[in-house]
Amino acid sequence: MRFHTLLFLSFLLLVSCALICTAQHPGLKKSGMFHENVGKGQHIEKKRSCIERMQTCEVEAGLPCCSGAPCICPYIGDCICIQ
């Protein structure tokens, strides 16, 4: 009986940690918001198109980012253009 209680509490702790992490790091969620990206001295409005963390966006993959330039998505935050 104690084993089952300990197992259940461990599961609850794991789920709560995952929920807290997701709430504190909105960059891990899919984002469809527009924002400004500074590139070569001008402001370019773009849409975040990297879907998963550490995913590389390529024009061939149908995931344009930074006006069609390749980019990398960090764990937290916006896409980083490779120019």
Curated annotation (Swiss-Prot):
Where, by tissue, is this protein expressed? Expressed by the venom gland.
Entry keyword Disulfide bond: yes
Which keywords are on file for this protein? Disulfide bond, Ion channel impairing toxin, Knottin, Secreted, Signal, Toxin
Q: List the disulfide bonds.
A: C50-C66, C57-C71, C65-C81
Parts of the chain that traverse the membrane: none
Q: Where is the signal peptide?
A: 1-23
- Propeptide at 24-48
Recorded GO terms, molecular function?
A: ion channel regulator activity; toxin activity
Kindly list the places in or outside the cell where this protein is found, as annotated in its UniProt entry: Secreted
Q: Tell me if Signal is a UniProt keyword of this record.
A: yes
Q: Which GO terms describe its cellular component?
A: extracellular region
Question: Origin, by domain of life?
Answer: Eukaryota
Which family does the UniProt entry place this protein in? Belongs to the neurotoxin 07 (Beta/delta-agtx) family. 03 (aga-4) subfamily. JZTX sub-subfamily.
Function noted in UniProt: Inhibits TTX-sensitive sodium currents in rat dorsal root ganglion (DRG) neurons.
> What does the record's free text say on domains?
The presence of a 'disulfide through disulfide knot' structurally defines this protein as a knottin.
Name of this protein: U25-theraphotoxin-Cg1a
